[in-house]
Amino acid sequence: METVLPKRKSHHLQGYDYSQNGAYFITICTHQRRMLFGPNQAPVGADSISARMAARVFREIIGQYPAAQCRYFVVMPNHFHALVEIQRPRADMESAPTVISIVQAFKRYSTVEYIRLVKRGQAAPFDKHLWQRSFHDHVIRNETDYRMIAEYIQSNPRLWHKDCFYEEPSHEP
């Protein structure tokens, strides 16, 4: 008897070619939204070795692709946002990255680096997966959309206390 597994629903824009030039807003969440890149109550940007590592890895991944750039990104305690732009000349179309390949490389390399931090006792252990299986993307279609998303990314740390996953600090001794 053959078991038929349910088809996984894609979060990506149906029929859209993610290898074409454009700007993309991506969000990647930690597995089970665990707070692995900084304490929940700490101000985002506080000295977290795991958050610094994720930022470094992302810069390195983007740096490997001349056709890709990222002016705005932020590492939050349980997720990551970036506004990625892909602009390449026609002749270079085959060798340039897709948003999906950038995200895959980031997840893979950041997981390897995070495991190194765990082994050195510098980061909290995680169960099987560092990142959720997929990621959310939004194709940016105009300048207004671009500016709104850039502002959202920049203000995300300041508004962390309003996030549904934020927890008030305990004042118990």
Which residues does each predicted region cover?
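Short catalytic/metal-binding and nucleic-acid-binding patches
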Residues: 1-173
